[in-house]
Structure formats: C-alpha cells, structure tokens
C-alpha cells in the first residue's frame, strides 16, 4: 500500500475482484494436502544432508524443530489468506508527517487513511515521552481531519502515535516505526524538541 502504483490498482474494485480470483485459484492449487506431500518429498532429499557434518554445525534448528516447522507449513496458506481478507476490512496504513513548530504551538499532520468500503475514518493521536507510551503527555480522539495542534512541549524526546478507525471499529497504525535494541516498534514516529524550540525528526538509516 505504500507504493503509489499499488495504491491506484487496489483502489479499483475491478482490480480487487480479479486479485481475489487469482489468489483463490492459487490457494486451491496450493492445498494443504498437496503442500504436505511436496514437503515430505523435499524432506527426504534435504534433511539427511542438513544434519550431517559440516552442515549440521550451521543448522539453525534442531531435527525436531525442523520437523515441526515443516509440518506447520501447509497451514500457512490459509492463515495468510485470512490475514489478507482481514486487511481489506481495515483502514489502510499511512505516514505521519514531521511536526512543525509555530510560536508556542506544535502542529502535527499525517496522510489520510483509506477505506475500501467508503467508511468514515476517525483518528486518535497520542504523544508520549517513551516508546511504550507509558508517559503520555497528550491524547486526542475522534479527529475527522488528519491534523492536530498542541502547546509546544519542553525540550526532549517524544513519540507520536496515530491510529485510524473505521465505522466497523477496525483500527490501523501508521507505517512509521522507531528502532530499539529489541527491534522495530511500529506505528509511531520519534521527534526531538530542541532547547530553542525547533523540531528535529529521528532518522534511522538501515
């Protein structure tokens, strides 16, 4: 959805219908029974070599874990299909803009979300001093337009989280993320308010 071309395609109902047909056709072909049979055939070829020297020294899984993973693979098709169906009932993700400081105010905006069912979408905004959002300094719910304004916080690090909610009550977070030692924390943007009242965005280069 973050790609402009894909957005244009997915906004077309006819395209989505054809996409559904193609996915269901592939899903029918990749049945659990068929995948299970194919996986067992590959296992008989691959596994004996994987757990012999020197390959076994680098194997990321034990033999038992390998068998468990192989046995679970056929179920992945149905699980992923259900996730795809569920995703179409939610608002689409979006990006949070870089806040702007104007006098003693901070203005925040973000891209519009999108509903495939043409539902009304409202937004909630939270600003916290920590990425776990345990120390929240600002919250606003039920916003109809993608922007909000608040008093410029004191100098420091802040995290912004915006969520979109449609009429069904389904929610969606923003594309943005913050990187910690534990990994990526999705749905938020990190900024810094400087001593002179300027706003700097946190930039992470992968």
Feature annotation, model-predicted:
Residues 113-134, 171:
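Solvent-exposed loop/turn segments flanking beta-strands in beta-repeat/beta-sandwich domains
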Residues 167-202:
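Extracellular fibronectin type III
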Residues 1-120, 190, 194-205:
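Middle-to-C-terminal accessory/interaction subdomains
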Residues 137-144:
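Short beta-strand segments within Ig-like beta-sandwich modules, predominantly Fibronectin type-III
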Residues 152-171:
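Beta-strand-rich modules
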Residues 146-150:
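Short strand-edge motifs at loop-to-beta-strand transitions and within beta-strands
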């Amino acid at each position: 959805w973050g790609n402009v071309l894909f957005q244009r395609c997915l906004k077309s109902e006819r395209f989505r219908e054809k996409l559904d047909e193609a996915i269901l056709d592939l899903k029918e072909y990749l049945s659990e029974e068929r995948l299970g049979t194919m996986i067992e055939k590959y296992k008989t070829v691959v596994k004996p070599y994987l757990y012999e020297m020197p390959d076994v020294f680098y194997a990321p899984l034990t033999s038992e874990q390998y068998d468990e993973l192989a046995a679970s693979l056929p179920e992945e098709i149905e699980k992923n299909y259900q996730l795809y169906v569920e995703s179409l009932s939610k608002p689409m993700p979006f990006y949070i803009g870089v806040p702007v400081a104007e006098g003693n105010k901070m203005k925040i905006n973000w891209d519009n979300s999108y509903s495939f069912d043409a539902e009304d979408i409202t937004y909630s905004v939270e600003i916290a001093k920590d990425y776990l959002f345990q120390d929240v300094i600002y919250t606003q719910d039920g916003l109809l337009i993608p922007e909000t304004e608040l008093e410029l916080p004191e100098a420091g690090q802040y995290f912004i989280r915006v969520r979109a909610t449609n009429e069904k009550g389904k929610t969606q977070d923003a594309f943005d993320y913050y990187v910690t030692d534990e990994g990526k924390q999705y749905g938020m943007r990190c900024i810094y308010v400087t001593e002179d009242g300027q706003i700097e965005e946190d930039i992470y280069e992968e």
